[in-house]
Amino acid sequence: MPEPQEGETFAFQAEIAQLMSLIINTFYSNKEIFLRELISNSSDALDKIRYESLTDPSKLESGKELFIKIIPNKEAGTLTLIDTGIGMTKADLVNNLGTIAKSGTKAFMEALQAGADISMIGQFGVGFYSAYLVADKVVVTSKNNDDEQYVWESSAGGSFTVRPDSGEPLGRGTKIVLHIKEDQLEYLEESKIKQIVNKHSQFIGYPIKLLVEKEREKEVSDDEAEEEKKEEKEEKKDDEPKLEDAEDDEDKKDKKKKTVKVKYTEDEELNKTKPIWTRNADDISQEEYGEFYKSLTNDWEDHLAVKHFSVEGQLDFRALLFVPRRMPFDLFENKKKKNNIKLYVRRVFIMDNCEELIPDYLNFIKGVVDSEDLPLNISREMLQQNKILKVIRKNLVKKCLELFEELAEDKETYKKFYDQFSKNLKLGVHEDSQNRQKLADLLRFNTSASGDEYCSLNDYVGRMKENQTQIYFITGESIDQVKNSAFVERVKKRGFEVIYMTEPIDEYVIQQLKEYKGKQLVSVTKEGLELPEDEAEKKKREEDKAKFENLCKVMKSVLESKVEKVMVSNRLVDSPCCIVTSQYGWSANMERIMKAQALRDSSAMGYMAGKKHLEINPDHAIIETLRQRAEADKNDKAVKDLVILLFETALLSSGFSLDEPGTHASRIYRMIKLGLGIDEDEPMTTEESSSGAAAAAPASGDAPPLVDDSEDLSHMEEVD
């Protein structure tokens, strides 16, 4: 046996070292998932070499047979997994097994510490490290076509070594040797390995072979029998001596021939099940679908729903699609590999990251598509232009929407689905004009009439009042915020239902979804809100417009370019005023969302931010008193300051942010001082403030007038 060559030692990246420490030092009951993860990694490696060989058959010259082999060795206490996949170069071993953390490493540790199941490990891309659940030392030997054979080795002590391997050549692929912990030796038992493979990996697309020990009867002569017995005795040492002696006595009586039991090893294939998607859907149980789903996705939970169908005619393909129970942690990451649908051609795996197969908004759907018509050696470039693929994609979208409609028939199941994937449906409304109305049917919202229950747009339309022609909605940060908003006061008081849209993506939905079933969607936060009115209400509104026309002009002259116009409102009940935006600009909520974008286009803020309109409530005491003050003296500086204060407060209550919050705060503090009767022109010492506070307060409970009696000046700073 050749001497092992000297290797290089590397430290594990900090997050990986933490993860390994967590795996090793925490008790987990379902350690068996380590085998599922290693088999899944082997399957991925085999997929890669098979895909490369479609365009370059010479890639398989280093080993044509594609398989996974498991070898338990009780004497040595090791479990070995061998695959003939693509293998790893030295750089792959160093980077992938220790020095570069996957994006999921930290997320998985956080999930674990929050009480998540260890079996989630594969979903976070760190399944290899689950080997340390049962092993105290792992040795990985790997050979890639582009490099020499290397060995990676670690006992998880914070570092690993990589060295060239001059041992038995693999040809191509990877061999993982797990040195099993003393308390985990059950994983070397044939029955245990078979049980785990059957449970987790029976639908892997490559043969999984287990090296098993068997016995057979063999007829031998006396001399050969003696030789066999001697060998057995040496192997068993002194176990069962009396039984051996008795058998020896019997052997001596047989003078010519003897039948003996001979032990031998052979490979036994553990996954002979034919691909589940090629079978008739009526013959497949929910348990079988569940096992296949878990094998396909490494999910630890059952799927929520499944759609199994075939299309025949001009185009032949079969598909099996699953909806998971929960959203993946990295569902909307830009650099996330789209690998949820595996593409097969005539049962041969082609690729698992075919972006042309399904639109982005359905990227949570997992499954298999098997085409009879695509060429086996199709390249990525050809796929982009392929008409067959476009037809397959159209059918997949159609079947997914059918599946969601079926889910919607059961309220509870649909709520589970919607809580996880509502953003995807809304993204679909924004992106998929062809299926926009079908997707709109699937949307659910809270409304002013639905309480805690979700409500569909169809339900809303069904409850609309006879004289109601529009669908009213409001966007905002939270249910509590929009529920108590000034904008919904009049609409709710008149008995009209308002839809509450509180997710940032809702703003994008309504940019595309202008109407539903012939009813226009109208934001109660924008100008142009028209509520059905009778003649008396119309008459009162005209009178209010005339009565407050002068105040509107005064307020506009004070606020200048801060608002486009000031007008009498038909939407307010309890609030004195509010800020609405122009029909085609951003709402306050959209402006907030855009300001939060790290890579936003600042120039867009100027022309997309909606023009602000200040609406005043003619029935509110503050507005009526302000009108009287303005009528008495339109140059009253107190009126000017109060208008600015009202405007800034309305900005905040309407969902906008202040450009100068410091100035607004100073203005509020001055109002508080006025309310407490403190003369801000006189500086106060601490002693004076403590002894004279009571004397400074006015005798009556009323706050002092804003304008000083001796001077026609406001104590509040005049703001240009």
UniProtKB/Swiss-Prot annotation:
Residues 217-258, 681-720 are annotated as: Disordered. GO terms for cellular component: cytosol; perinuclear region of cytoplasm; plasma membrane; protein-containing complex. Its main location: cytoplasm. Pfam families: HATPase_c_3, HSP90. ATP binds at residues 41, 83, 102, 128, 380. GO terms for molecular function: ATP binding; ATP hydrolysis activity; ATP-dependent protein folding chaperone; unfolded protein binding. The keyword DNA damage does not apply. It comes from the Eukaryota. Keywords: ATP-binding, Chaperone, Cytoplasm, Nucleotide-binding, Stress response. SMART domains: HATPase_c (SM00387). The TPR repeat-binding motif mediates interaction with TPR repeat-containing proteins. Molecular chaperone that promotes the maturation, structural maintenance and proper regulation of specific target proteins involved for instance in cell cycle control and signal transduction. Undergoes a functional cycle that is linked to its ATPase activity. This cycle probably induces conformational changes in the client proteins, thereby causing their activation. Interacts dynamically with various co-chaperones that modulate its substrate recognition, ATPase cycle and chaperone function. Required for piRNA biogenesis by facilitating loading of piRNAs into PIWI proteins. This is Heat shock protein 83.
